[in-house]
C-alpha cells in the first residue's frame, strides 16, 4: 500500500502570524511522523500574497518544504492561484522559486499540465496547471493509460457543486465537473472546506479567522 498525505491551501502570509504557523506546522509534523506517508502532496496555495512575496515568507516556506521532506520519500508540489503572477504568467511563480532555492531532491515541482510518471512509485500524476485553465489533460494531451499505474488528478480550483465555509455552492458552466477527472483518485485544493465527491476531496489549511480549526478537519491519508 502506498500512503499519501494530501495537503492544500497553506497560505503563508507575508509578514504576520509566523509564530502561529510554526505551532500548527509542529502539530502536522507530529502527525506525519506517526502516519509515515511515503508521499506528501501539496495542491496549491503555499503562499497567500501572489503579487509580492516577502523574504520572511520565503524562509518560512522553504523551511516548511524541507521539514515535510523529512517525513516522506518524496514531496509533490503544484501552484495555486495565490502562487502565480496573474498579470505576467511568463514570470517564475513563487513556488517554483522556493523549490529551486532549497534544491531538495525529494521535492518535485510539476510545472505544466500533463501526465507525469512518478520515479519512485507506480503512480502517474495528472496535473491540471492552474494558469492553463483551457487544457483538459485527459482530452487535450495524448496519452495511453497504463493499467499498471495509479492515476491521480491534481487540481486547484472550484469543482462544480462544491461548497465553501459560508455555504455558497459553486455552480457555473465554466467550473470543472467531478466527472472530468478520470484518475483513480483526485486531490483538490482552493475551497478551504473538507468535502467529498466520488473521489476523495479534502485539504489542509491555516484558516484566516481561526488558525487551529484545520486541526479538527485533519489531513487526508490515501
Model-predicted regions and their roles:
Residues 83-177:
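Conserved catalytic scaffold of divalent metal-dependent phosphoesterases
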Residues 31-32, 68, 141-145, 214:
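Hydrophobic helix-cap positions at the C-terminus of alpha-helices
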Residues 159-160, 165-208, 213-216, 220-222:
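Conserved beta-sheet core of the metallophosphoesterase superfamily
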Residues 8-12, 45-47, 81-83, 127-129, ...:
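Active-site metal-binding loops of divalent metal-dependent hydrolases
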Residues 76-78, 125, 154, 187-188:
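A structural signal for short, well-ordered beta-strand segments and their strand-loop junctions
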Residues 2-4, 39, 121-122, 150-152, ...:
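Structural motif
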Residues 36, 71, 119, 146-149, ...:
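Residue-level preference for short coil/turn positions at secondary-structure junctions
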Residues 2-3, 10, 14-115, 179:
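Core catalytic region of metal-dependent phosphoesterases/phosphodiesterases
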Amino acid at each position: 500500500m502506498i500512503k499519501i498525505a494530501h495537503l492544500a491551501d497553506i497560505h503563508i502570509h507575508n509578514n504576520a502570524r509566523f509564530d502561529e504557523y510554526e505551532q500548527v506546522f509542529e502539530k502536522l509534523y507530529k502527525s506525519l511522523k506517526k502516519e509515515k506517508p511515503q508521499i506528501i502532496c501539496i495542491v496549491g496555495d503555499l503562499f497567500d500574497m501572489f503579487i509580492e512575496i516577502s523574504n520572511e515568507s520565503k524562509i518560512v516556506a522553504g523551511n516548511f518544504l524541507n521539514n515535510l521532506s523529512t517525513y516522506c520519500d518524496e514531496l509533490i508540489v503544484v501552484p495555486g492561484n495565490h502562487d502565480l503572477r496573474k498579470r505576467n504568467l511568463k514570470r517564475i511563480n513563487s513556488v517554483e522559486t522556493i523549490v529551486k532555492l532549497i534544491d531538495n531532491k525529494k521535492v518535485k515541482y510539476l510545472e505544466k499540465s500533463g501526465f507525469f510518471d512518478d520515479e519512485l512509485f507506480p503512480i502517474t500524476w495528472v496535473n491540471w496547471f492552474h494558469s492553463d485553465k483551457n487544457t483538459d489533460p485527459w482530452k487535450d494531451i495524448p496519452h495511453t493509460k497504463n493499467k499498471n499505474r495509479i492515476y491521480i488528478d491534481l487540481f486547484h480550483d472550484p469543482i462544480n457543486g462544491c461548497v465553501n465555509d459560508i455555504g455558497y455552492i459553486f455552480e457555473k458552466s465554466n467550473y470543472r465537473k467531478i466527472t472530468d477527472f478520470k484518475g483513480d483518485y483526485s486531490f483538490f485544493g482552493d475551497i478551504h472546506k473538507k468535502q467529498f465527491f466520488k473521489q476523495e476531496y479534502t485539504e489542509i489549511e491555516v484558516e484566516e479567522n481561526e488558525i487551529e480549526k484545520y486541526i479538527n478537519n485533519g489531513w487526508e491519508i490515501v
